[in-house]
Amino acid sequence: MLRAKIFRTALAIAVSLAAAELLPAGEVQETFLSEGVTQRVGGYRPIRGEMDQEASIVTKTPEDLTAPKFGWMEIGEQKWAFVIDEPEEGDARLLVDTNGDGDLTNDPATEWKAREQGEFKTHFGRAQVQLNEEKTGWLGMYRFDPADKRRAQLKNTLMYYPDFGSEYSFELDGQML
């Protein structure tokens, strides 16, 4: 009985593969998505950006920084400097060296907002980064309140994730997939 099931399964696979060889091969098309990928796939895997760098990782910063912390965001071979300015009074700011030139004064503004969560604030936001000469993509990011003792190991960490990617489609049996 088990041998017959295995044989039928193997036969079905062989017939399917043979039939696939008879179908005309369609061209695979890639569409770059600069944002919204995490919503489409239903989640993300955060990456840690430690704020353990010296100010020398950038060449120019806004003059009004009061409590800056510097770090790198890395994805594959690429990396972008960032700074979080968290003054004792006033709102925190996030700056990202989108184009990788070391100048934090010539990049698009980031989105960075605090959300009260009990007695603590968690900051959420996003920023564009230059992937190559033609493409920019969005990174989502968040930072837990450094005063939250439950998350003490993340006290000097920016969590980030790519929200960009590629979608692939091809024609099979007259239908675009």
Residue ranges and their predicted role:
Residues 1-5:
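N-terminal secretory signal peptides that target proteins for export/translocation
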Residues 24-177:
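Calcium-binding acidic motifs and repeat modules
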Residues 9-21:
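Bacterial N-terminal signal peptides
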